[in-house]
From Swiss-Prot:
<keyword id="KW-0028">Amino-acid biosynthesis</keyword>
<comment type="pathway">
    <text>Amino-acid biosynthesis; L-lysine biosynthesis via DAP pathway; (S)-tetrahydrodipicolinate from L-aspartate: step 4/4.</text>
</comment>
<keyword id="KW-0457">Lysine biosynthesis</keyword>
<keyword id="KW-0220">Diaminopimelate biosynthesis</keyword>
<dbReference type="GO" id="GO:0005829">
    <property type="term" value="C:cytosol"/>
</dbReference>
<dbReference type="GO" id="GO:0016726">
    <property type="term" value="F:oxidoreductase activity, acting on CH or CH2 groups, NAD or NADP as acceptor"/>
</dbReference>
<comment type="function">
    <text>Catalyzes the conversion of 4-hydroxy-tetrahydrodipicolinate (HTPA) to tetrahydrodipicolinate.</text>
</comment>
<feature type="binding site">
    <location>
        <begin position="142"/>
        <end position="143"/>
    </location>
    <ligand>
        <name>(S)-2,3,4,5-tetrahydrodipicolinate</name>
    </ligand>
</feature>
<feature type="binding site">
    <location>
        <begin position="7"/>
        <end position="12"/>
    </location>
    <ligand>
        <name>NAD(+)</name>
    </ligand>
</feature>
<dbReference type="GO" id="GO:0051287">
    <property type="term" value="F:NAD binding"/>
</dbReference>
<feature type="active site" description="Proton donor/acceptor">
    <location>
        <position position="132"/>
    </location>
</feature>
<feature type="binding site">
    <location>
        <begin position="75"/>
        <end position="77"/>
    </location>
    <ligand>
        <name>NAD(+)</name>
    </ligand>
</feature>
<dbReference type="InterPro" id="IPR000846">
    <property type="entry name" value="DapB_N"/>
</dbReference>
<keyword id="KW-0521">NADP</keyword>
<feature type="binding site">
    <location>
        <begin position="102"/>
        <end position="105"/>
    </location>
    <ligand>
        <name>NAD(+)</name>
    </ligand>
</feature>
<dbReference type="InterPro" id="IPR022664">
    <property type="entry name" value="DapB_N_CS"/>
</dbReference>
<feature type="active site" description="Proton donor">
    <location>
        <position position="136"/>
    </location>
</feature>
């Protein structure tokens, strides 16, 4: 399988370049960064592209990839419901093309989101804290936003988080994602970390995941690359490939 990498000079992208090059069943067909023409992907007969670029350019990348029938595995964040709808509309004309967009490719992070969804209905309160390096473009992270949405979905019909706060500085209680407070920390020395806190009378449950190195994303990305052709259309999250429901 011929695989191209977009964002190849970034920290995650460079990790993916090394991972693809080291895989016996994959061939690195192209490695592109800012300013490189996307036509290098078609020139190299690329079948699947790994995209770790920037929210400002990822939609243009996807439009090109879909138009050319190239499968895409996307770790770039910043996706909204409107962006997902746009991707789906592009895919209508290319029914055999696959796009997988995931907020996090670390297997442990995907499992932590799954565990949080399972735990959500058993506790009165839930909050999410995500911690990342200071170069991250979006806040909160895609992982934190998706975690909060999964928690909110699991808590449908239950009372909202108890919170008597009546006065506060703007932002002190975090961002509100479907009723779940999400707090973002940006600190030098961090990579990617998340805590989900659940509380009820007499006990607290903490679900924490830490990516200590960007190689933590490699197994999930390569799994998606190898299996993406099995799932035509848009897939959001790595969960379907891990049989997590």
């Amino acid at each position: 399988m011929r695989v191209g990498v977009l964002g190849a000079k970034g920290k995650v992208g460079a990790t993916m370049v090394r991972a693809v090059a080291a895989a016996d069943d994959l061939t690195l067909s192209a490695e592109l960064d800012a300013g490189d023409p996307l036509s290098l992907l078609t020139d190299g007969n690329t079948e699947v592209v790994i995209d770790f670029t920037h929210p400002d350019v990822v939609m243009g990348n996807l439009e090109f990839l879909i138009d050319n029938g190239i499968h895409a595995v996307v770790g770039t964040t910043g996706f909204t419901a409107e962006r997902f709808q746009q991707v789906e509309s592009w895919l209508v004309a290319k029914p055999n093309t696959s796009v997988l967009i995931a907020p996090n490719f670390a297997i442990g992070a995907v499992l932590s989101m799954h565990f949080a969804k399972q735990a959500a209905r058993f506790f009165d309160s839930a909050e999410v804290i995500e911690l990342h390096h200071p170069h991250k473009a979006d806040a909160p992270s895609g992982t934190a936003a998706r975690t909060a949405k999964l928690i909110a979905e699991a808590r449908k019909g239950l009372p909202p988080n108890p919170d008597a706060t009546s006065t506060s500085l703007p932002g002190a209680r975090g961002a509100d994602v479907d009723g779940i407070p999400v707090h973002a920390v940006r600190l030098a020395g961090l990579v990617a970390h998340q805590e989900v806190l659940f509380g009820t009378e007499g006990e607290i449950l903490t679900i924490r995941h830490d990516s200590l190195d960007r190689t933590s994303f490699v197994p999930g990305v390569l799994l998606a690359v190898r299996r993406i052709a099995e799932r035509p259309g848009l897939t959001v999250g790595l969960e379907p490939l891990l049989d997590l429901h």
